[in-house]
From Swiss-Prot:
Main location: mitochondrion
Name of protein: Small ribosomal subunit protein mS41
Region (Disordered): 122-141
Taxonomic lineage from the root: Eukaryota, Fungi, Dikarya, Ascomycota, Saccharomycotina
SMART domains: IGR
Gene: FYV4
Subcellular location: Mitochondrion
The UniProt record lists the keyword Mitochondrion: yes
Organism, as annotated: Scheffersomyces stipitis (strain ATCC 58785 / CBS 6054 / NBRC 10063 / NRRL Y-11545) (Yeast)
Length: 171
């Protein structure tokens, strides 16, 4: 930062910087100092290689189901392991096969993305509710706090009873 301040103090204004540039050669601009620092500190080695998860590299249904995750592999036998049969199956047919709604919608979403080559295949994790979900959060937290207070109250009463039995408390 001191190097930056010294450059600002030396240059003063654009005219002064131009005069110095004519006399001494080019001056390092303030912008080049800022832009020379890297924007990201994470190394490239942490990024996953998604080139193998594209439409050109997936030729069987088992690989497709393993890449999209969410335990869709258990439905492999319904499609007889045939990717073409899966891609030609409609939502209504999947319903008659006995695939539950959330899994069926997930599979259809990935089928659309796969056919149109929109996104590399990967698992979309299911969201987890915190404190019973947004709608129930207040009641769940209130019950949790009430139970905690009740436990503390019972613990205090037990400690007082023990102290009274030992003769430490005289009432």
């Amino acid at each position: 930062m001191s190097l930056f301040k010294s450059l600002v103090a030396r240059s003063g204004s654009g005219i002064r910087a131009a005069q110095i540039a004519r006399q001494n050669g080019p001056v390092i601009s303030q912008i080049s100092i800022i832009s020379s620092q890297p924007f990201s500190t994470s190394p490239v080695s942490y990024k996953t290689n998604t080139s193998t998860r594209t439409k050109e590299n997936v030729h069987d249904l088992e690989t497709f189901f393993r890449l999209i995750g969410r335990n869709t592999v258990e439905h492999l036998d319904l499609f007889e392991g045939d990717l073409a049969k899966f891609l030609s199956t409609s939502s209504q047919q999947m319903k008659f096969m006995g695939i539950d709604v959330s899994t069926r919608r997930y599979m259809l979403r990935w089928k659309h993305k796969f056919e149109n080559d929109l996104e590399p295949l990967r698992e979309h994790k299911k969201g987890k509710k915190k404190n019973g979900g947004e709608r129930n959060a207040k009641t769940v937290l209130a019950k949790k706090n009430a139970l905690k207070k009740l436990e503390e109250k019972e613990k205090f009463a037990a400690e007082e009873l023990d102290a009274e039995n030992r003769g430490e408390r005289l009432f």
